[in-house]
Amino acid sequence: MHDPKESLETNIQETESQEKLPETPIIEEEPILTLPDDQINQLQQEVAELKDQLIWQKAENENLRKRQARELENAYKFASERLLKDLLPVIDSLNLGLQAALDTENEAVKQFITGSEMTLTMFQETLARHGIEEINPVGEKFNPELHEAVTMTPSEAHEPNTVIQVTQKGYLLNGRTVRAAQVIVSK
């Protein structure tokens, strides 16, 4: 009979001899690609141009993103401009009505004036909360960005180019002129 121990040892020895590999691996060398200098220079120039284009495109994208953010912010800030322009004649009429009624002695009219003044004050406070400012420049230097000169009149009590009377109040919305104040300016 065959001894299983001997058979196992023989198999192990055969396997070990088959597993031994040569100590130096065989490496196939690929040929090294060589290009002429002018072709290398041309490729380097193309790479540099592509890098410049990439940098320019990144800057352009960043500028576009900033511009869109600014436009969105402005759209939000000035969205109520049309509504304000429609409300300005109402405010003007309310102010004129109050001024005309101030000289009355009638007690009922005085109560109406008090209520109207309170309403106008609430209205102006609401406008102010939404970034709307009144331009009432009496005594200030004339500023063509904020004021529209209706007429000029000589005045010894005021320096030249000073607003001496407002004929119609102006309004700003978040710092931008919606309506310039109509004013009388000293000569």
UniProtKB/Swiss-Prot annotation:
Molecular function, one GO term: protein homodimerization activity
Keyword list, A-Z: Chaperone, Cytoplasm, Stress response
GO biological process: protein folding
Major subcellular location class: cytoplasm
InterPro entries: GrpE, GrpE_coiled_coil, GrpE_head
Lineage of origin: Bacteria, Pseudomonadati, Pseudomonadota, Gammaproteobacteria, Cardiobacteriales
Protein name: Protein GrpE
Record note on quaternary structure: Homodimer.
Gene: grpE
Annotated TM spans: none
Pfam families according to UniProt: GrpE
HAMAP family per the UniProt record, alphabetical: GrpE
